[in-house]
Amino acid sequence: MAITLEEAPWLGWLLVKALMRFAFMVVNNLVAIPSYICYVIILQPLRVLDSKRFWYIEGIMYKWLLGMVASWGWYAGYTVMEWGEDIKAVSKDEAVMLVNHQATGDVCTLMMCLQDKGLVVAQMMWLMDHIFKYTNFGIVSLVHGDFFIRQGRSYRDQQLLLLKKHLENNYRSRDRKWIVLFPEGGFLRKRRETSQAFAKKNNLPFLTNVTLPRSGATKIILNALVAQQKNGSPAGGDAKELDSKSKGLQWIIDTTIAYPKAEPIDIQTWILGYRKPTVTHVHYRIFPIKDVPLETDDLTTWLYQRFVEKEDLLSHFYETGAFPPSKGHKEAVSREMTLSNLWIFLIQSFAFLSGYMWYNIIQYFYHCLF
């Protein structure tokens, strides 16, 4: 496509802005991530003496790092509008977020919209594709205790066993509360045809805006984390206090991400900011764990039903530009999620000052030794 004289200045500015944003992102990572690693190393004695306090401090730094990623999109004009139930009400309980997956920007969107939900981000465990392990943020996720899952039928059984072991070793010992899971097992554009063929073959719902979810990881999580009452039934969100310290998993948060015109944001756009300001819409529904079946077939059916409902939610959004009202309400109410510019300035200042401090400390010891 030929570029007109009128478009040339705008495209030139877009290129310059993208290069400036990329340069800042690189510098931001070079000061923030090594500083995080240095703090974690220096705090290892505390991990031995007071593990809970160590993981609390680590979680706060982890939240700040995710806040920096969120700020890259925020200052590019990529904002979030929230719909449905208010998940702040369950921010102190254990929960699993089931999220539809369209692009890499989904992760960035969640990093942004969960920043104002108390300590949720600090105490969160992500389940993400193993490819993220090799990104700039991979080392941080490894330290924090996120789980990288390898996709593919040949890996499936092994990965589920590894997930079970990972939860047993890291979830409660690190005082985690929420788990973020993308049950579709991949991006919409990559899985849609396969999912539709599977649905047609097995007489299952034919979906366009989402794909049929996989139940394996969800089942492992529920079996590992749902506290059992003495009668054997799962302890739901409204159950009485259990004898054990933890009430176990209490909620499933069905999370639906929608982009205007069904055009998702990828992580390159989030970093470079070459797309016009965009409002991403996130819809929440909360289900008590006592209403979620644990048997494999029943759980699979339950998950399918949730994604059929996601399909309807997204169809309504793409037609009207808004999500439908919840049951019992005449109008759907949206809430604009905002980030504090002062808070962003403070965490960025801390990152750069920490980077400067650690650089000087390492340089000092290097000169002493060599």
Curated annotation (Swiss-Prot):
<protein>
    <recommendedName>
        <fullName>Acyl-CoA:lysophosphatidylglycerol acyltransferase 1</fullName>
        <ecNumber>2.3.1.62</ecNumber>
        <ecNumber>2.3.1.22</ecNumber>
        <ecNumber>2.3.1.-</ecNumber>
    </recommendedName>
</protein>
<dbReference type="GO" id="GO:0071618">
    <property type="term" value="F:lysophosphatidylethanolamine acyltransferase activity"/>
</dbReference>
<dbReference type="GO" id="GO:0005737">
    <property type="term" value="C:cytoplasm"/>
</dbReference>
<feature type="transmembrane region" description="Helical">
    <location>
        <begin position="22"/>
        <end position="42"/>
    </location>
</feature>
<keyword id="KW-0472">Membrane</keyword>
<dbReference type="Pfam" id="PF16076">
    <property type="entry name" value="Acyltransf_C"/>
</dbReference>
<dbReference type="GO" id="GO:0036152">
    <property type="term" value="P:phosphatidylethanolamine acyl-chain remodeling"/>
</dbReference>
<dbReference type="GO" id="GO:0036148">
    <property type="term" value="P:phosphatidylglycerol acyl-chain remodeling"/>
</dbReference>
<keyword id="KW-0812">Transmembrane</keyword>
<keyword id="KW-0594">Phospholipid biosynthesis</keyword>
<dbReference type="GO" id="GO:0005789">
    <property type="term" value="C:endoplasmic reticulum membrane"/>
</dbReference>
<dbReference type="GO" id="GO:0045723">
    <property type="term" value="P:positive regulation of fatty acid biosynthetic process"/>
</dbReference>
<dbReference type="GO" id="GO:0012505">
    <property type="term" value="C:endomembrane system"/>
</dbReference>
<dbReference type="GO" id="GO:0016746">
    <property type="term" value="F:acyltransferase activity"/>
</dbReference>
<keyword id="KW-0256">Endoplasmic reticulum</keyword>
<comment type="function">
    <text>Lysophospholipid acyltransferase involved in fatty acyl chain remodeling of glycerophospholipids in the endoplasmic reticulum membrane. Selectively catalyzes the transfer and esterification of saturated long-chain fatty acids from acyl-CoA to the sn-1 position of 1-lyso-2-acyl phosphatidylethanolamines (1-lyso-PE, LPE), with a preference for stearoyl CoA over palmitoyl CoA as acyl donor. Acts in concert with an unknown phospholipase A1 to convert palmitate phosphatidylethanolamine (PE) species into stearate ones.</text>
</comment>
<keyword id="KW-0012">Acyltransferase</keyword>
<dbReference type="Pfam" id="PF01553">
    <property type="entry name" value="Acyltransferase"/>
</dbReference>
<dbReference type="GO" id="GO:0005783">
    <property type="term" value="C:endoplasmic reticulum"/>
</dbReference>
<dbReference type="GO" id="GO:0003846">
    <property type="term" value="F:2-acylglycerol O-acyltransferase activity"/>
</dbReference>
<dbReference type="InterPro" id="IPR032098">
    <property type="entry name" value="Acyltransf_C"/>
</dbReference>
<dbReference type="GO" id="GO:0047190">
    <property type="term" value="F:2-acylglycerophosphocholine O-acyltransferase activity"/>
</dbReference>
<comment type="similarity">
    <text>Belongs to the 1-acyl-sn-glycerol-3-phosphate acyltransferase family.</text>
</comment>
<keyword id="KW-0808">Transferase</keyword>
<feature type="short sequence motif" description="HXXXXD motif">
    <location>
        <begin position="101"/>
        <end position="106"/>
    </location>
</feature>
<dbReference type="GO" id="GO:0071617">
    <property type="term" value="F:lysophospholipid acyltransferase activity"/>
</dbReference>
<keyword id="KW-0444">Lipid biosynthesis</keyword>
<dbReference type="InterPro" id="IPR002123">
    <property type="entry name" value="Plipid/glycerol_acylTrfase"/>
</dbReference>
<keyword id="KW-1133">Transmembrane helix</keyword>
<dbReference type="GO" id="GO:0047144">
    <property type="term" value="F:2-acylglycerol-3-phosphate O-acyltransferase activity"/>
</dbReference>
<dbReference type="GO" id="GO:0019432">
    <property type="term" value="P:triglyceride biosynthetic process"/>
</dbReference>
<feature type="transmembrane region" description="Helical">
    <location>
        <begin position="342"/>
        <end position="362"/>
    </location>
</feature>
<dbReference type="GO" id="GO:0003841">
    <property type="term" value="F:1-acylglycerol-3-phosphate O-acyltransferase activity"/>
</dbReference>
<dbReference type="GO" id="GO:0016020">
    <property type="term" value="C:membrane"/>
</dbReference>
<dbReference type="GO" id="GO:0036149">
    <property type="term" value="P:phosphatidylinositol acyl-chain remodeling"/>
</dbReference>
<keyword id="KW-1208">Phospholipid metabolism</keyword>
<dbReference type="GO" id="GO:0008654">
    <property type="term" value="P:phospholipid biosynthetic process"/>
</dbReference>
<keyword id="KW-0443">Lipid metabolism</keyword>
